[in-house]
Amino acid sequence: MKYWIGLIASVVIGAQVQAQSDPYSAAVFYPSCLAAGNIVQGKHPAADSPEATNQLRQAAICFGAITAIMNVESYFKPEFAVCPPADTKVTLAQMVLAVTARLKNYPEQRQDNFYRLAVAALAEAWPCSK
């Protein structure tokens, strides 16, 4: 009997460990970036509603992650640098939309690291001349 209990417990524990997702995968950030994309496009519920609070709370994760990326962008390798045209400034809203579009258009990459995908999306949107 102890054998069966131990066997079942190990299977259940193993399944739970395997079911946990990578906290840095793009799949984890995807709902947050969708919410952020909706906010920057003006698609949001009434300002005083619980839905608006939930949307903002969820979007804050994506806004924060992209802001963090841009704060360290100057340390990136040249192939990951972001180079907007000289006379323009890229806004956080534009960056959110670029990253969200990448996540929407390449669902097969959502299991990959969010930060790598976001950096690649930004470098693709605003490439540097070689």
Predicted regions and their residues:
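Acidic, glycine-rich flexible loop segments
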Residues: P84, L92, L97-Q109, E124
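Short N-proximal segments of mature Sec-exported proteins
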Residues: Y24-M95
